[in-house]
Amino acid sequence: MTSIYHDDDDHLTASGKDLWSNFCVLVDAAVMLYEEEEEEQRRKIVSEEEEEFQKRIFCLFPRKTRSSLVKRQQNLIRVSTSSSLIDLNQFPTDSEIEDPQNHLQGLSSSCFIAANSETKTLQNPSSEPCSSLGLFGHKTAEYQKTETKDPPNPNFPCTMSLCLMENTSRKRRAVEQRKRSGGVKKANVAPFSQTARETPEWLVKVMTNMKEAKDAKLIFEKTLFVTDVNPTKNRLSMPFNNLLRNDFLTSVESIIINEDINNNNKIGVGAILVDQRCKKWGVMLKRWEMKKESGKGSWSYNLICGWNDIVEANRLKEGDNITLWSFRCCGILCFAMEQSSSSLALCLC
């Protein structure tokens, strides 16, 4: 068999061998693509089965419906500073739930009774505690001794309100302490007042002609520097500190930009730039760090890959004022560049 294959190889021409090699590569690629599609389909089926299983859980084990009054009363029991205010048998019955006002009155009266029983116990420590206090034993007796230092206020309908007011005042004091110590940091808010400008008419026409274009935002204004029009640089720098707003990227685009921070070969986000002559250019948006001699750096967005063509076509030069808008067309990031009147007139000549 080996000799037969060797004889066949001898008769094959060089072009035939190349064709056979390319065919093998194509077959391998097709097999890999088929396996990837099968794996993706299998994962999708598994995820759908898991989701369906989660839905069936609550069908087999329905959640128990509870009255809002019961939940509210249980929460009050947890935050109560007195362990003997409410008896364990004081939970509302069906009739009490139907008439919550009567039940609340009974609850308030039980609070007064419990408070009076505590006072009597403190005045006569040798006497036996009431039945409700006996449930808690020695711990309740110890707590009653400490409670004499701060007796309940009879002006309130129930000592539970004291607990709620104490928690509220405690939180308020904590907030005031953080403010005095400078622990509260204010978030950086984009100056949206500067962006309250009507969309230019030429941009409205461009978006209308492009179809499905929407969400125009004024994001950047700049007087061009020498580096912005230098052909060797081939970029427009947009420092973060000079951005009017920084919400023009989607979550996926932001992830791509952030992952490029530590990469030497940055991928960037592809975009379209439209000038006032309605001419479209393909550009790339990347994030760079501008390092200084002091060791500290500043971040900026940069429009590259085609910026030199835009500078040449629009005759941009140092000192020209430009305004940059962003919008979306079929989900694609787009920019619109508006020039100052003088540079635009020179460009149209």
From Swiss-Prot:
SUPFAM superfamilies to which the protein is assigned, alphabetical: DNA-binding pseudobarrel domain (SSF101936)
UniProtKB keywords: DNA-binding, Nucleus, Transcription, Transcription regulation
GO molecular function: DNA binding
Coiled coil segments of this chain: none
Superkingdom of the organism of origin: Eukaryota
Disulfide bonds: none
Pfam family, one: At2g31720-like
Cell location: Nucleus
DNA-binding region(s) in UniProt: 240-341
Principal place of residence: nucleus
Entry GO terms, CC: nucleus
Keyword Glycoprotein appears in the UniProt entry: no
PANTHER family per record: B3 DOMAIN PLANT PROTEIN-RELATED, TF-B3 DOMAIN-CONTAINING PROTEIN
Name of this chain's protein: B3 domain-containing protein At5g24050
Species name: Arabidopsis thaliana
